[in-house]
């Protein structure tokens, strides 16, 4: 517990240093309104990264969420284009996202194949389905499906009490998933499954039901992100989630989750989402090309993960150094 919270505090300190450093280059980075409203450009990544954290803590992984976002986005556009009332279209889109997650869970549970392989397959399945729907609707290129009601397109651009709506939804998701993972018996089951699925099964923990809930929640979060993105951009496109994969997984790992399962923290992921998002924005405001900013993001991930590994194993490192000092090589 102490180490985990220490890691989260270190991430928070790094976030402050990052903002101040970019603020020294461009003072706009220190403007509170800019910091709040610029989150709308990347906070949907966080909405997906939160349940993805729970999936990874359970020892699984889902890399299909980007395609799920694209499929849900274009499905929302097709439903609206077909004359379905907007509230019903949104509800059906959310159900579609949850269904995509359940498909992942069902295939993983009943085939016993590695989740990475299964979700790689569904990534292409959902992406292909999105392109098929897009072609059937006549939406080509970057145009997508438009013409949504103004009340819908304004939703993701509104603010409540000075906070943008996407950020508010992210904070609600943060509270829900934090309570679920860290304050409930079901959350403790997630950690146990990640540490040893066989022991969890012998302990009468509903492993399959838990995995279904986790993957369905990731699919549902992807659908929520899709609805927000369509509202934000005013267009439903099949490629809306194409760039989400690496930032989301980076945020989860950077936030402290063990990629092999058994440990992780929702708060850490939330801070890491802001860290990665503001890093990209700060580099863009500093005039750094996208290719360089992507490389720097990867370098940051490597440095921080190595630093965390050292902090978690510092006692073993001290013992190894002591042995080397007492038994120097000839």
Curated annotation (Swiss-Prot):
Entry keyword Cell wall biogenesis/degradation: no
Keywords: Cell inner membrane, Cell membrane, Membrane, Transmembrane, Transmembrane helix, Transport
Pfam families linked to this entry: BPD_transp_2
InterPro entries attached to this UniProt entry: ABC_transp_permease (IPR001851)
Disulfide bond residue pairs: none
A single Gene Ontology CC term: plasma membrane
CDD domains, A to Z: TM_PBP1_transp_AraH_like
Disulfide bond is among the record's keywords: no
Record's subcellular location: Cell inner membrane
Periplasmic face residues: 26-42, 137-159, 231-237, 280-285
TM region positions: 5-25, 43-63, 68-88, 89-109, 116-136, 160-180, 210-230, 238-258, 259-279, 286-306
Membrane-protein topology: Multi-pass membrane protein
Family: Belongs to the binding-protein-dependent transport system permease family. AraH/RbsC subfamily.
Name by which UniProt lists this protein: Autoinducer 2 import system permease protein LsrD
Species of provenance: Escherichia coli O157:H7
Taxonomic lineage of the native organism: Bacteria, Pseudomonadati, Pseudomonadota, Gammaproteobacteria, Enterobacterales
Gene: lsrD
């Amino acid at each position: 517990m102490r180490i985990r919270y220490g890691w989260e505090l270190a991430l928070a300190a790094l976030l402050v240093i990052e903002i101040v450093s970019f603020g020294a280059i461009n003072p706009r980075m220190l403007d509170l309104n800019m910091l709040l409203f610029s989150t709308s450009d990347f906070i949907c990544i966080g909405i997906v990264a939160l349940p993805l954290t729970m999936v990874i803590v359970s020892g699984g992984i889902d890399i299909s969420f980007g395609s799920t976002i694209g499929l849900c986005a274009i499905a929302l556009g097709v439903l609206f284009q077909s004359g379905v009332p907007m509230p019903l279209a949104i509800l059906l889109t959310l159900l579609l996202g949850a269904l995509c997650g359940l498909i992942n869970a069902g295939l993983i549970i009943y085939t016993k194949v590695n989740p990475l392989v299964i979700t790689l397959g569904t990534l292409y399945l959902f992406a292909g389905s999105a392109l098929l729907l897009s072609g059937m609707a006549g939406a080509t290129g970057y145009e997508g499906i438009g013409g949504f009601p103004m009340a819908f397109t304004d939703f993701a651009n509104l603010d409540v009490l000075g906070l943008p709506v996407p950020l508010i939804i992210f904070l609600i998701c943060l509270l829900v998933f934090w309570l679920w993972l860290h304050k409930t018996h079901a959350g403790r089951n997630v950690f146990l499954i990640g540490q040893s699925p066989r022991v969890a099964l012998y302990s009468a923990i509903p492993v399959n039901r838990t995995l279904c809930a986790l993957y369905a929640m990731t699919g549902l979060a992807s659908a929520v992100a899709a609805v927000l993105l369509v509202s934000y951009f005013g267009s439903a496109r099949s490629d809306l989630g194409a760039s989400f994969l690496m930032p989301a997984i980076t945020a989860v790992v950077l936030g402290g989750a063990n990629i092999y399962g058994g440990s992780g923290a929702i708060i850490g992921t939330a801070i890491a989402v802001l860290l990665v998002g503001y890093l990209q924005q700060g580099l863009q405001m500093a005039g750094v090309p996208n290719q360089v900013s992507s490389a720097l993001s990867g370098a940051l991930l490597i440095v921080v993960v190595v630093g965390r590994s050292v902090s978690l194993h510092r006692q073993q490192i001290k013992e190894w150094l002591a042995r080397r000092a007492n038994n120097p090589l000839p």
